[in-house]
């Protein structure tokens, strides 16, 4: 008598969900994807950056070549300050030299299309499937959708984003009434973002990026193939919001926010108004920041934005989600291979999910902390960040490359598929430790020096 196959139910046709579907397909593990919306790749104005840690996994899956066909690799970044000072960095080129892959941006919709069209069996991907309940059974789990259907499997994976229904069901199944409140306290909102895509402007060259820093505001532009402009307008809010007291903005607010900033210079003679007037799409969202502690319960687990959410400043949110999917697929492949003719038991799955969190948490924590730091540095949030950004960063050689490299090295890779031919020495270097020590060490020295200057200034005034 043959053993029933192990089946994974992926909730969410997101980047993390579709990447996991590809990973499981290559591992020979049965799965389905349940997507709440009517289409996998909706017409939305967001763009997404693929960095080497995400690119390497997608390359293993045979997907990256399709991304290459539609993107313009970044080579140069320009950083501009409110006083008109600017400097240029070739850190994108350094990243490519170290890891073999460039930093590349494309519309989120296009990336989802690539993931969907390159997946060979669309009968495994269901749309209009809004999951409303997750239930645990003996050695099995099921999900109920709004249309009344029930899907049974051996593991449920929530890849359903910031307001994850699967994660809320996990917290409910855990049976601890205070869990949701405790986890919620770590979910905050301090920034809002208008993101969009605009038609080309001659002074914004393809393959280049501009970061324009203002007090409480960061404007990022990435210039893609044929000059297409992907942009982010990231504004600090008047106060910090903590769950459940979360601000929700309307799309109509985007116009008011952006109209006020039309005169701000982005690069050379280009103002934000020039970019705004050439917009093809634009959307407004608040930027949640959190790193949850409870990722799984029984036979349910979450990946990607469901459990860790970062601002777009550092560009690692999507790539970290890709890594989550790869790490979980590795563990599932290993377990099923080990069990052979037997299906994994509840205790097997429980151990696997603990291993998943243990394996991922430290790396995710580091990337999350670095993302928060970069966001506030760019927004000139407070005196120390203002001085660090203006008077240290421009003279710190390839600091941006060091910071980025530290969060790329040590990335997850699919251990049951061959490594890509594309590679670089950066994967084997110890950038991770040195980057944090450089920043922490300098911050300590800089703070001490700043305190001395302030004390001397006060003494002079007093005398």
UniProtKB/Swiss-Prot annotation:
<dbReference type="Pfam" id="PF01494">
    <property type="entry name" value="FAD_binding_3"/>
</dbReference>
<dbReference type="InterPro" id="IPR036188">
    <property type="entry name" value="FAD/NAD-bd_sf"/>
</dbReference>
<feature type="binding site">
    <location>
        <position position="305"/>
    </location>
    <ligand>
        <name>FAD</name>
    </ligand>
</feature>
<keyword id="KW-0560">Oxidoreductase</keyword>
<comment type="similarity">
    <text>Belongs to the paxM FAD-dependent monooxygenase family.</text>
</comment>
<keyword id="KW-0274">FAD</keyword>
<keyword id="KW-0285">Flavoprotein</keyword>
<feature type="binding site">
    <location>
        <position position="318"/>
    </location>
    <ligand>
        <name>FAD</name>
    </ligand>
</feature>
<dbReference type="InterPro" id="IPR050562">
    <property type="entry name" value="FAD_mOase_fung"/>
</dbReference>
<feature type="binding site">
    <location>
        <position position="35"/>
    </location>
    <ligand>
        <name>FAD</name>
    </ligand>
</feature>
<feature type="binding site">
    <location>
        <position position="108"/>
    </location>
    <ligand>
        <name>FAD</name>
    </ligand>
</feature>
<comment type="function">
    <text>FAD-dependent monooxygenase; part of the gene cluster that mediates the biosynthesis of the indole diterpenes nodulisporic acids (NA). Nodulisporic acid A (NAA) and its chemically modified derivatives are of particular significance because of their highly potent insecticidal activity against blood-feeding arthropods and lack of observable adverse effects on mammals, in particular the tremogenicity associated with the paspaline-derived IDTs is not observed.</text>
</comment>
<keyword id="KW-0812">Transmembrane</keyword>
<dbReference type="InterPro" id="IPR002938">
    <property type="entry name" value="FAD-bd"/>
</dbReference>
<feature type="transmembrane region" description="Helical">
    <location>
        <begin position="438"/>
        <end position="458"/>
    </location>
</feature>
<dbReference type="GO" id="GO:0004497">
    <property type="term" value="F:monooxygenase activity"/>
</dbReference>
<dbReference type="GO" id="GO:0016020">
    <property type="term" value="C:membrane"/>
</dbReference>
<keyword id="KW-0472">Membrane</keyword>
<keyword id="KW-0503">Monooxygenase</keyword>
<dbReference type="GO" id="GO:0071949">
    <property type="term" value="F:FAD binding"/>
</dbReference>
<keyword id="KW-1133">Transmembrane helix</keyword>
<feature type="transmembrane region" description="Helical">
    <location>
        <begin position="5"/>
        <end position="25"/>
    </location>
</feature>
<comment type="pathway">
    <text>Secondary metabolite biosynthesis.</text>
</comment>
<protein>
    <recommendedName>
        <fullName>FAD-dependent monooxygenase nodM</fullName>
        <ecNumber>1.-.-.-</ecNumber>
    </recommendedName>
</protein>
<feature type="binding site">
    <location>
        <position position="49"/>
    </location>
    <ligand>
        <name>FAD</name>
    </ligand>
</feature>
